[in-house]
A protein has these predicted regions:
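Enzyme catalytic cores with a strong preference for nitrogen-chemistry domains
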Residues: 1-313
Length: 313
């Protein structure tokens, strides 16, 4: 009975909170996301780089027609080192200058020069060039790094390139005028404590850039999308999602999934999103309540165990 009352109470509180939630007084901005729908088999082909970049530029110029505050490209939109290719960097700088709009570009990078570790990064570009960068912190095990490499080093022979990524160490909040924002890359969206760090660091909305082409036409992209409402509700923050092959979407602070682009479609998605105005209880306190509940539960189990233990002499 107690468990049922707790469940009903929790659901009732959540429904009431959603019904009374208001964004009155909050500012808002227009955001555009690009979904180029580049097949995984073509994405990393050097012979396709020019063609793929042309697709991105065309979609970006189309997105700029509605005058968004920022245009979001997906994870690893450029599969060559952006900072190591002056011609590519200059082309993107000119593109941002031409449309008078910052662009968030997912790209591969290197740490400390041409022989450094690979990084999965997001670059904030304006007409002045790169003004900020975020390096992915939570890497995909056996995809971007090998856990326990000392014991499982033989795995590197199976995936020599993608298993040598380094992890970032800074939760960058991008300096979009009037609307600073953070981004999580790919499956980083499943980590509430990482997401929380961007919000308490000043992000007024969040972006999620990803390349879900790996999943193909499976339920994977939809399951991945399904984690966004959890993060949105925890922080009462809007999320804009740019996915290579889908599903690109917008999620409002109440966790409602808004406009989406179909899986494998190519196009542009626009939405006016509210900016965060306050911090939730979870944003302020973090996971301490979870730890407290776990401690109370363990203590209760221990007390019950010792009370039931038969007396011995």
């Amino acid at each position: 009975v107690a468990a049922a009352l707790l469940l009903v109470g929790t659901l009732g509180f959540g429904a009431r909170a959603l019904g009374t939630m208001s964004v009155a007084g909050a500012g808002s901005i227009d955001v555009a996301v690009i979904q180029p729908s580049i097949e995984q088999t073509l994405k990393w082909d050097p012979a396709r780089h020019a063609q793929i970049l042309d697709i991105y530029e065309r979609l970006t110029r189309e997105a700029a027609l509605t005058r968004p505050a920022v245009v979001l490209w997906p994870e690893t939109a450029t599969t060559i080192f952006l900072r190591g290719d002056p011609e590519l960097l200059e082309r993107l700088r000119r593109l941002s200058a031409d449309i008078a709009t910052p662009i968030l570009v997912g790209s591969i990078d290197r740490r400390d020069g041409p022989r450094g570790q690979f990084l999965n990064s997001a670059f904030f570009l304006t007409g002045q060039g790169i003004t900020a960068k975020y390096d992915k912190i939570h890497l995909v095990p056996f995809g971007e790094y090998v856990p326990l490499a000392g014991l499982l080093g033989f795995v590197k022979g199976w995936a020599e390139f993608i298993s040598e990524f380094g992890e970032g160490d800074t939760q960058t909040v991008f300096p979009l005028p009037g609307a600073p924002f953070g981004t999580v890359i790919c499956y980083e969206i499943i980590f509430p404590e990482l997401f929380r760090g961007f919000v308490i660091g000043g992000a007024s909305f969040m972006a999620n850039i990803t390349n879900d082409a790996w999943f193909g036409e499976t339920s994977g992209p939809w399951q991945h999308l399904g984690t966004l409402p959890l993060r949105a509700v925890e922080q009462r923050v809007a999320i804009a999602r740019a996915a290579n092959t889908g599903v690109s979407a917008f999620v409002d602070p109440a966790g409602r999934i808004g406009p989406t682009l179909p899986l494998l479609a190519r196009g542009v998605l626009h939405q006016r999103i509210p900016l965060r105005t306050s911090l939730t209880l979870y944003a302020r306190l973090g996971d301490w309540l979870v730890y407290a509940c776990a401690a109370i539960g363990l203590a209760g189990a221990g007390i019950a165990f010792f009370r039931r233990s038969p007396a011995t002499c």
